[in-house]
Swiss-Prot record:
<keyword id="KW-0414">Isoprene biosynthesis</keyword>
<dbReference type="InterPro" id="IPR013644">
    <property type="entry name" value="DXP_reductoisomerase_C"/>
</dbReference>
<feature type="binding site">
    <location>
        <position position="151"/>
    </location>
    <ligand>
        <name>1-deoxy-D-xylulose 5-phosphate</name>
    </ligand>
</feature>
<feature type="binding site">
    <location>
        <position position="152"/>
    </location>
    <ligand>
        <name>1-deoxy-D-xylulose 5-phosphate</name>
    </ligand>
</feature>
<dbReference type="Pfam" id="PF13288">
    <property type="entry name" value="DXPR_C"/>
</dbReference>
<dbReference type="GO" id="GO:0070402">
    <property type="term" value="F:NADPH binding"/>
</dbReference>
<dbReference type="Pfam" id="PF08436">
    <property type="entry name" value="DXP_redisom_C"/>
</dbReference>
<feature type="binding site">
    <location>
        <position position="10"/>
    </location>
    <ligand>
        <name>NADPH</name>
    </ligand>
</feature>
<dbReference type="InterPro" id="IPR026877">
    <property type="entry name" value="DXPR_C"/>
</dbReference>
<feature type="binding site">
    <location>
        <position position="125"/>
    </location>
    <ligand>
        <name>1-deoxy-D-xylulose 5-phosphate</name>
    </ligand>
</feature>
<keyword id="KW-0560">Oxidoreductase</keyword>
<feature type="binding site">
    <location>
        <position position="227"/>
    </location>
    <ligand>
        <name>1-deoxy-D-xylulose 5-phosphate</name>
    </ligand>
</feature>
<comment type="similarity">
    <text>Belongs to the DXR family.</text>
</comment>
<feature type="binding site">
    <location>
        <position position="38"/>
    </location>
    <ligand>
        <name>NADPH</name>
    </ligand>
</feature>
<feature type="binding site">
    <location>
        <position position="150"/>
    </location>
    <ligand>
        <name>Mn(2+)</name>
    </ligand>
</feature>
<comment type="function">
    <text>Catalyzes the NADPH-dependent rearrangement and reduction of 1-deoxy-D-xylulose-5-phosphate (DXP) to 2-C-methyl-D-erythritol 4-phosphate (MEP).</text>
</comment>
<comment type="pathway">
    <text>Isoprenoid biosynthesis; isopentenyl diphosphate biosynthesis via DXP pathway; isopentenyl diphosphate from 1-deoxy-D-xylulose 5-phosphate: step 1/6.</text>
</comment>
Length: 398
């Protein structure tokens, strides 16, 4: 039985992870849960799965959770703060760590799991976007194992030879006959919206993804295709891919989750119903297979699968992310931090949908920084980018 810490248990990925545990109670034991401030959901999870430990982001939330659990006779020990999340990620009696905290807040707990030599189920793409080189070096140094959870990277992982699966970030794609990696994306809910109407898109409209059930921040990133741009950066890092070895394809049906094209002309793809429980179950059981609880793909009802090139006029955030990827780690860190702050204000109705790309580009172009030489420098760049993004946003506030 594998013992599990879930970082970000009350979020979308965390809930899906617990669904897989629920469907496979003989294979997994939840040892620890960590979350932000969603006390009610965390309490429900603790009462159902009875973890030994739980952590909340702040002392007030932890105190309320502790009281709720005591009243229900639950003996879960409750802690708070970033260090608590790091400690739970590195527990001696844990085998797997689900890294599901959204944003750069997930970086240090994920690194703690790596330094403890854990098997890391990586849903926190920001860890690679901001700290890719240091992150992958730490994985190798501490003999940790990385398994990607994003549906696209999980699909690519499944389509690669085992020798690359077990040597992420270091394998030579060409040596193993791989021509390029094909990253698919739905294009979000505004593929056909007239460009002049995009400025009037509301947060609720941007969060209504046609295929996937996700959190609000990642739903907005999907609508701008920033999410695909961040996944492009992550894929280059995970699979040691150059610009010439990467391709982005818009695939509205979200049935093919990504592909690998080989030098002999073969293309290997991973298909499935759009549900995060599938890649999560794959990673949790790797190299075996278990029930995910997801409805099997019905080929008779699929209809037509379509593909097109991304329109950079419609998706300027995708173009910016690809440019940042090949500019270096400082640029990707700036972009990620700025985008988090910008999307936060958009979700509060503070700026327009089209302002997201404009402000992101302004921040990236203004902050032309040298490459970071440590995690500490990455976090400094992150803070600088957030400060500049917040200042820049002020002139756009409606």
């Amino acid at each position: 039985m594998k013992r599990l810490t879930i970082l970000g248990s009350t979020g979308s990925v965390g809930k899906s992870t617990l669904t897989v545990v629920r469907n496979n109670p003989d294979k997994f034991k939840v040892t620890a849960l960590a979350a932000g401030k969603n006390i009610q959901v965390m309490a429900e999870q603790c009462l159902e799965f009875r973890p030994q430990y739980a952590a909340m982001a702040d002392e007030v939330s932890a105190k309320e959770l502790r009281q709720l659990l005591i009243e229900q006779g639950c003996k879960t020990e409750v802690f708070f703060g970033e260090q608590a999340a790091c400690d739970l990620a590195a527990l001696n009696d844990v085998d797997q760590v689900m890294s599901g905290i959204v944003g750069v807040a997930g970086l240090l707990p994920t690194l703690a799991a790596i330094r403890a030599g854990k098997q890391i189920l990586l849903a926190n793409k920001e860890s690679l976007i901001t700290s890719g080189r240091f992150f992958m070096d730490a994985v190798a140094k501490h003999n940790a194992q990385l398994l990607p959870i994003d549906s696209e990277h999980n699909a690519i992982f499944q389509s690669l030879p085992e020798v690359i699966q077990r040597n992420l970030g270091r394998g030579d794609l060409k040596q193993y006959g791989i021509a390029n990696i094909i990253l698919t994306g739905s294009g979000g809910p505004f593929r056909h919206t007239p460009l002049e109407q995009l400025a009037f898109v509301t947060p609720d409209q941007a969060c209504a993804h046609p295929n996937w059930s996700m959190g609000r921040k990642i739903s907005v990133d999907s609508a701008t295709m920033m999410n695909k741009g961040l996944e492009y950066i992550e894929a280059c890092c995970l699979f040691n891919a150059s610009a010439a070895e990467m391709e982005v394809v818009v695939h509205p049906q979200s049935v093919i989750h990504s592909m690998v094209r080989y030098q002999d002309g073969s293309v290997i793809a991973q298909l499935g119903t759009p549900d995060m429980c599938t890649p999560i179950a794959y990673a949790m059981a790797y190299p075996n297979r278990i029930a995910s609880g997801v409805e099997p793909l019905d080929f008779y009802s699929l209809g037509t699968l379509t593909f097109s090139k991304p329109d950079y006029e419609r998706y300027p955030c995708l173009k910016l992310a690809i440019e940042a990827c090949h500019a270096g780690q400082a640029a990707t860190t700036v972009l990620n931090a700025a985008n988090e702050e910008i999307v936060k204000i958009f979700l509060q109705n503070g700026i327009s949908f089209t302002d997201i790309a404009i402000i992101n580009r302004q921040v990236v172009e203004k902050l032309n920084l040298s490459e970071p030489q440590s995690i500490e420098e990455v976090l400094q760049i992150d803070n600088l980018a957030r400060d500049l993004a917040i200042k820049t946003i002020r002139s756009f506030i409606r």
